[in-house]
Amino acid sequence: VINSEDDLTSFKIGSTVLYTVGKFIPKSRIGVIVKKEDIILARDKVKTSARNMIYARVENIIRISNNVDVHLKSDELTLISRITRTTADELNITAGDHIYVIFKASSPHLIREEN
């Protein structure tokens, strides 16, 4: 955890700074989970109310029925986004592409590390 004020906490994974709601003790260690259904993908950088926007590499694409799980990597951060097959086709996403990963500060679920 880098900073926590006004019910907004910033934390770092590798060199990537992310934001979540809630109060945490600065310099504390936490675990982070973001549900794949909460992650939005965009080809271009967009102006949005979402606090978290990461430029990531598409590592793998797994088709599951009418959905697609897009496996993403940026620095030490690994994420999976679940999108519809139609959206994947419209965005023309392929392994090796770089894409913007977007999620709101309310999306990450943080787990406090016990001492």
Regions found by a protein language model. Give the residues of each.
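A structural signal for short hydrophobic beta-strand segments in well-ordered beta-sheet cores
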Residues: V1-I2, V58-I61, L72
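Conserved active-site beta-strand-loop modules that form the wall/rim of enzyme catalytic pockets
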Residues: D7-T9, S28-R29
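Glycine/charge-rich catalytic "coupling/switch" loops of P-loop NTPases
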Residues: S15-I61, R82-N115
